[in-house]
């Protein structure tokens, strides 16, 4: 008789003795801080595996990119269709200090702008800021009806399109090339678009002129001092600073 395994014999199950560990018990929570150029600096929280052995939590956090609505950062719903990318450059305590990494439009906003009976004009420019950031800015514009126009269509001639595009490139180079990255992030949402609209009014009236996308091509060598200056020269939590200011004001009022 052949000797084999008796399958009917009950075996002890190995899996029962193992206890499942919650993966979140090994993680730490860090606050993500936006640069001081934005009105709201608390972006949110991010999770990372706790430092163990040679694996450092700070190294895992550096380089992370967060996409945030500009409406949340500026506390203004008019900017809801703009998305800002923030990159973690430094970790201090439980705070992740970020820097501007790019800007984009939501796809639904872009689709809502494109319509019939008008001309779409696009331009892209590669510029270097005064603090050596290499950026590529993409501009978009649409033709609109002149006052008292009867004709339904507002198509621009190819010569007019070339003239408008030339103006767009000139304005973007002038505005972006003479400013730092922090100053440029304030201008991108509204100011540059309005400048283009004013300058090209004589060629053909435009509407919905926007910088629809900003791409960061190259960053200068990392400078901790510059990053801390961008975050208000302090790595501590903003809440502490606000309480101190409020406390001083109440003392002055009571005196």
Curated annotation (Swiss-Prot):
Residues 19-28 have a biased composition (Basic and acidic residues). The keyword Acetylation applies. GO terms for biological process: translation. InterPro entries: Ribosomal_eS1 (IPR001593), Ribosomal_eS1_CS (IPR018281), Ribosomal_eS1_euk (IPR027500). The modification N-acetylalanine is found at residue 2. Keywords: Acetylation, Cytoplasm, Ribonucleoprotein, Ribosomal protein. Pfam families: Ribosomal_S3Ae. GO terms for cellular component: cytosolic small ribosomal subunit. Component of the small ribosomal subunit. Mature ribosomes consist of a small (40S) and a large (60S) subunit. The 40S subunit contains about 33 different proteins and 1 molecule of RNA (18S). The 60S subunit contains about 49 different proteins and 3 molecules of RNA (25S, 5.8S and 5S). Belongs to the eukaryotic ribosomal protein eS1 family. This is Small ribosomal subunit protein eS1. It comes from Paracoccidioides brasiliensis (strain Pb18).
């Amino acid at each position: 008789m052949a000797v084999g395994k008796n399958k009917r014999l009950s075996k002890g199950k190995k899996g029962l003795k193992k206890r499942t560990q919650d993966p979140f018990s090994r993680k730490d929570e860090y606050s993500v801080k936006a640069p001081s150029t934005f009105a709201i600096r608390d972006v949110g929280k991010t999770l990372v595996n706790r430092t163990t052995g040679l694996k450092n939590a700070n190294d895992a956090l550096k380089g992370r990119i967060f996409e945030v609505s500009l409406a949340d950062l500026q506390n203004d719903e008019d900017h809801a269709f703009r998305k800002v990318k923030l990159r973690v450059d430094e970790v201090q305590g439980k705070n992740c200090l970020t820097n501007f990494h790019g800007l984009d439009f939501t796809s639904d906003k872009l689709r809502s702008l494109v319509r019939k009976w008008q001309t779409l004009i696009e331009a892209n420019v590669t510029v270097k800021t005064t603090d050596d950031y290499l950026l590529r800015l993409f501009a978009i514009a649409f033709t609109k009806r002149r006052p008292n126009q009867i004709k339904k269509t507002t198509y621009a001639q190819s010569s007019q399109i070339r003239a408008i595009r030339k103006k767009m490139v000139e304005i973007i180079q002038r505005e972006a090339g003479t400013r730092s990255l922090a100053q440029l992030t304030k201008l991108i949402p509204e100011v540059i678009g309005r400048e283009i609209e004013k300058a090209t009014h004589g060629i053909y009236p435009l509407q919905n002129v926007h910088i629809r996308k900003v791409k960061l091509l190259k960053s200068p060598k990392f400078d901790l001092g510059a990053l801390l200056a961008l975050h208000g020269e302090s790595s501590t939590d903003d809440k502490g600073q606000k309480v101190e200011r409020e406390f001083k004001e109440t003392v002055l009022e009571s005196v």
